[in-house]
Amino acid sequence: KTTTTTTLLLLLALTFNAWGQTKEMSINPEESSIHWLAKKVTGQHDGTIKITSGSLTMQNDLISGGNFEVDMTSIFVSDLNGEYKQKLEGHLKSDDFFSVDKFPKANLLIKETRQKMPNHYEINADLTIKGITNPVSFEMHIEDNVAMSKLIIDRSKFDVRYGSNSFFENLGDKTIYDDFEIDVTLKF
């Protein structure tokens, strides 16, 4: 009976080991960064936004999931100063754009991952902005407790309409392109 019990325990241990270890890697929000870039017919603007919390789920040392929260009230414009900077930050936070009083947080939930090569992943996730969730796909590189990604987000899918040719005609040089870029650096 002792041999049977020992054998059973050994098989269970091997089975659990084969399933692999799952661990959560929490980000350090102070050392992580999100840089955004939005373009219009006559130029572009860029800035930052703060990530408040998040983690990657690792299975057998491979990314298997993750969840991140962004503070939309922290929208910061880097390319302007003074009055113009304040006006643009206020406008981006208004109902014309991201309605941060109603929707102070944005979330990204990783749904699927595929390793393309060591430390490089293709990620499928759900992004929620203004209470609207849409799928997004992007690539992520992770090495030495740092993950980096670039996402292209179509703002029109999140009801961010101001200056968009998707919703308004004859905007001419007042058009703001629907796609904007975010460069993300996460430190764990």
What are the roles of these predicted feature ranges?
Residues T6-N17:
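Bacterial N-terminal signal peptides
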Residues G20-F188:
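Low-complexity, acidic/polar, glycine-enriched regions of mature
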